[in-house]
Amino acid sequence: MSEFRKIQDPLSKFPKGYQRNNPNILNHVVERIESGDPFHYLFTGVVGCGKTHLASNIVRCTGERWDLVKVIKFYHKYLNLMSSDYSDKWDAIGQQNTIMQSRILVIDALGDDKPSTDAAHDYFSSLIEMRYDYIYKNQDTRTIITTNLDAKEIINTYSSRVMDRLQEYFVICKFKETSFRKKNLVILEA
């Protein structure tokens, strides 16, 4: 039995009209939240289609404490700690382990790791492996990963092993929206 609190009418927790054009995704998410069951989602789509916004709203409506890993900031912090003295390296590893073992985790903007090097890709591959192992051992977890990459790009950037792990536990949701910023774009010509 899941320890997660069941949410009555989770749809009311989302902003009015939000993601109504993605009813399959939203209905699936709402079912999982209502039941209190663990969930793992991989949201893919172009920049600005609402992946991060939906992820944060999903987690907020659970009422649980959660960790958000912004890929770019997390990797820079990790690099800075690893390039400092010995004790900071152990702090970095300990912090990383704590975050990967949280009950609710959002990894935002996977594939936006800068610098985009083999070392960065290896690092994030290992993070996905750590989370995969934790999910396998502790069924009562929730994870959301957002990315602008599609499945083929994830395989090319990280590995087929990472994609295989994601496919085992994650519901993959493809957002077909265009950027909301483009919808609001006004170009004035002189």
Model-derived segments and their meaning:
Residues 38-55:
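Walker A/P-loop nucleotide-binding motif
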Residues 38-42, 104, 142-144:
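Residue-level preference for the first positions of well-ordered beta-strands
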Residues 1-33, 169-173, 177, 181-190:
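A short, basic N-terminal segment
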Residues 101-103, 169-170:
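Short, well-ordered alpha-helix to beta-strand connector turns
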Residues 53-64:
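P-loop NTPase Walker A phosphate-binding motif
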Residues 63-101:
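Short glycine-rich substrate-engagement loop in P-loop NTPases that contacts/grips substrate
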